[in-house]
Regions:
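Short, well-structured segments within or immediately adjacent to enzyme catalytic domains
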Residues: 3-232
């Protein structure tokens, strides 16, 4: 239900903004991003608990459409930051596809970020969804608590399954599954198949990101619902 409400905001925003989409957020302070902030487990990092990163329209473009911060936190996400000996829930569980608003530097296969990639389509307006179609493009998903940082979720396209890589990790706290929403407004629960997709949360920044995951069917499944190669 939370994801469906977030996805509704993603659908409403371009109606009020010349068809332009929000950006996913790659730095925590990116102008035009759906949310602000950078999450980790550092007790001195205010972003972990500062709901203004979600509710202040200057920081979060979804803010005018979602008046409560609770929508951004999946009830199954039990991660926390310890401050002064007390446990505090962090404010957000979801990440947005880097193909939504770009720049999409993690999309091309390989081990590094390609800031000016021109191979894969970036969706900057809702009218861009016509190919491959909005029902085939994921927008938001539950992200692994030890993977989440800025608002964007990075995953890589797959040209050779044997060279597939996992950049960020999805959550699997729904009995090995994650909630995921699509550009047409529908949401579903995706059951992951490969154990490499589902490392147990450690409530720490110890999870290695951007790792080889050859022939991982989950990496391939998500890539098939991320974007397509440019045709021009």
């Amino acid at each position: 239900n939370n994801l469906k409400q977030l996805q509704l905001a993603h659908l409403m925003y371009p109606d009020d903004n010349g068809d332009y989409l929000t950006k996913p957020g790659n730095s925590g302070t990116e102008a035009g991003a759906w949310v602000g902030g950078w999450l980790d487990f550092n007790p001195s990092n205010r972003d972990n608990t500062n709901i203004q990163d979600l509710l202040d329209p200057k920081r979060a473009k979804f803010a005018p459409y979602l008046p409560t911060a609770k929508i951004y936190l999946c009830p199954a996400d039990k991660s926390f930051v310890r401050i002064g000996g007390k446990r505090y829930s962090r404010i957000r569980s979801m990440g947005m596809s880097q193909a939504m608003g770009g720049p999409g530097g993690w999309l091309p296969p390989g081990s590094g970020f390609q800031a000016n990639q021109k191979t894969y389509k970036i969706f900057t307006k809702s009218s861009d969804f016509s190919h491959p179609g909005p029902s085939n493009l994921y927008v938001l998903l539950d992200e692994h608590p030890d993977s989440i940082n800025a608002g964007g979720y990075a995953n890589q396209m797959v040209s050779n399954p044997g060279s597939a890589r996992m950049i960020d990790f999805p959550a699997s706290y729904h009995n090995g599954a994650a909630g995921i929403s699509f550009a047409d407004g529908h949401a579903e629960t995706k059951k992951w198949r490969d154990p490499r997709t589902m490392p147990p949360p450690e409530n720490a920044n110890t999870l290695a990101l951007n790792v080889a995951s050859p022939n991982n069917p989950d990496v391939i499944w998500l890539a098939d619902r991320t974007t397509v190669k440019k045709t021009d």
